[in-house]
Regions:
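Membrane-helix and juxtamembrane interface regions of eukaryotic multi-pass membrane proteins
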Residues: 1-168, 193, 199-214, 218-224, ...
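Hydrophobic alpha-helical membrane segments of integral membrane proteins
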Residues: 168-175
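Alpha-helical transmembrane segments and their membrane-interface exit regions
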Residues: 175-186
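Blade-edge beta-strand/turn elements of extracellular beta-propeller
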Residues: 188, 194-195
Length: 401
């Protein structure tokens, strides 16, 4: 699928081309306007939009935050905006890009192939991670080395996509961000004095579930697919089908897979989309160099390691919010259940210590329960006494024992 956004102005393409050629990122000039636009959007949101809206929407909270927390607040606003934007775009491309779907049958195209729509996703992600790198480096004491490492490795992974390299996997790994909205909501609940409430509890469960599913299960599986495709392509010497390949007795031979658009039936847009799949690949294209595979796979490994580490920290954080604290909205229910357990335990202890009850003991118990039954009758008639909590009833029975 072609890039749905307009192309960059020619002067910008010509200005970027020398740098992109030096870095061997040939598709970057055609998406540089999207990279810059994303960076400007996120920086403007952090510096202007978030402070302005936060002062209006939360006049009694945001202005009273200290400088450190206010910076963190604005960064979380940007993160929330970016995750909603990039997730929607990535899912749309994965479902609508037919040329990308055709790459499912070819490891070579998944590594070397390119579509404008996937390039858009990589551009938006690159713009965000450039901003993320700047913020993480500037406020290193606030966010720590882990966030900085994430920014560096993520930027490297998505920037390498402009070779193009693993352009197919751009939307795939962006789905890591599906858990980010829940993470930001959890953080905002703490700052809005909603810690321990129902919203934070349910959001926390969704956060752990989505994070585990998207980053740990989906992410690890897709990383293994990347490793497999890279290994296959690096060691590809002979492949059947319409493949032209210069064999130089080395895994660094050039590789080229043409698409002729025969299935487009004269559709001009289809032909254009098909022709750009190998737009930046030709007979002069070298196979994957070892350093590129090493950098990409190492960055991917770092990201996956961070994901597993953060998952453990999130479980610890959620437990601290709720462990040992009765839920604010259910204190009476919790006390009622506790009193029932205590009553049952006391009866069990009595039977264990005193042995089975004699008929005389049972008669005494029957007499002792008579007042409780009368209270139950009053409860059925709707008296005020019947509205007393089950905790008091339970305590009354325990004391009689």
């Amino acid at each position: 699928m072609l890039d749905p956004l307009p192309p960059p102005p020619p002067w910008l393409v010509n200005w970027v081309k020398p740098y992109s050629e030096a870095l061997y990122l040939p598709s970057l000039p055609y998406h540089i306007h999207e990279v810059l636009g994303a960076f400007v959007l996120y920086q403007t949101t952090q510096s202007i939009i978030s402070p302005m809206l936060s002062n209006i929407l939360f006049p009694h909270i945001y202005p009273k935050l200290n400088r450190r927390t206010r910076i963190n607040w604005d960064v979380h606003v940007v993160s929330l905006l970016q995750s909603l934007l990039i997730n929607s775009a990535a899912l749309w491309v994965m479902f609508k890009d037919k040329e990308r779907k055709d790459m499912n049958s070819s490891a070579v195209e998944r590594i070397y192939g390119y579509t404008g729509a996937s390039g858009l996703i990589q551009a938006l992600a690159t713009g965000y991670f450039v901003w993320d790198l700047v913020v993480s480096a500037r406020y290193l004491k606030i966010f720590g080395p882990g966030i900085l490492a994430h920014a560096v490795t993520a930027l490297a992974v998505f920037a390498l996509g402009f070779r193009p390299f693993c352009n197919y996997y751009g939307p795939v790994f962006i789905l890591y961000e599906l858990s980010t909205p829940f993470l930001n909501i959890h953080w905002f609940c703490d700052k809005l004095n909603m810690t321990g409430g129902k919203l934070q509890w349910y959001n926390g469960m969704l956060l752990l579930s989505v994070f585990f599913g998207c980053r740990l299960i989906w992410g690890t599986y897709q990383s293994l697919r990347v490793y497999q495709d890279v290994w296959h392509t690096m060691h590809l010497n002979i492949q059947s089908g319409p493949v032209l390949r210069e064999i130089r007795e080395s895994p660094h031979s050039s590789i080229f897979i043409p698409r002729d658009g025969q299935l487009c039936l004269g559709d001009a847009s289809c032909i254009s989309a098909q022709s750009e799949v190998m737009k930046f690949t030709g007979s002069q294209t070298l196979a994957i160099p070892f350093w590129l595979a090493l950098v990409y796979l190492t960055c991917n490994l770092v990201l996956n390691t961070l994901n597993w580490y953060w998952f453990g920290k999130m479980i610890e954080t959620v437990r601290k919010r709720f462990e040992g604290k009765p839920h604010d909205e259910f204190p009476r229910e919790r006390q009622r259940k506790q009193s029932m357990v205590e009553l049952a335990a006391s009866e069990l202890d009595y039977d264990t210590l005193s042995g089975p009850k004699t008929p005389y003991n049972e008669k005494e118990d029957e007499i002792a329960r008579a007042p409780a039954r009368s209270k139950d009758n009053e409860f059925a008639r709707g008296t005020d006494f019947a509205k007393s909590s089950a905790v008091q009833d339970g305590d009354h029975e325990v004391k009689k024992r």
